[in-house]
């Protein structure tokens, strides 16, 4: 299982994606610890605005100019998960989610969520609806203080 230093290193490696726009989302294998939302491709057009770490959870905040609600991906890497950035690389066997980001020059970077054991999770949270959603921050993060 990735320890805190690895999760923090992952967070820091993702920071160059802040300010970039999601251009494509591909869920290749939706079954992880919790099923990945079928409408995760709704992130297309959103801009990554902030990345946070709470214990071993990563929180990626997204904003869209035409949608006032902030959306967050809550990610846990599980025992064998990783987030890796690639340019023009085909997905590997255990790459479950691919998210394409475009910078202001149109350069595409693909974020691969790789998890051979499938113990990790990716939850899509709409921040206005935290209380009404069964998989909320509170459920996973409240005990962290």
PLM region descriptions:
Residues 1-68, 98-107:
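Extended, highly charged segments
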Residues 68-145:
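Phosphate/anion-contacting hairpin/loop surfaces
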């Amino acid at each position: 299982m990735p320890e805190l230093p690895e999760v923090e290193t992952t967070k820091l490696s993702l920071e160059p994606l802040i300010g970039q726009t999601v251009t494509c989302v591909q869920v290749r294998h939706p079954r992880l610890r919790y099923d990945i939302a079928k409408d995760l491709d709704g992130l297309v057009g959103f801009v990554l605005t902030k990345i946070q770490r709470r214990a071993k959870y990563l929180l990626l905040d997204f904003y869209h100019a035409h949608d006032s609600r902030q959306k967050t991906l809550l990610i846990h890497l599980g025992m064998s998960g990783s987030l890796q950035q690639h340019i023009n690389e085909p997905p590997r066997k255990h790459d479950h989610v691919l998210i394409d980001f475009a910078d202001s020059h149109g350069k595409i970077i693909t974020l691969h969520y790789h998890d051979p054991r499938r113990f990790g999770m990716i939850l899509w949270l709409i921040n206005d609806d935290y209380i009404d959603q069964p998989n909320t921050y509170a459920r996973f993060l409240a005990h962290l203080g």
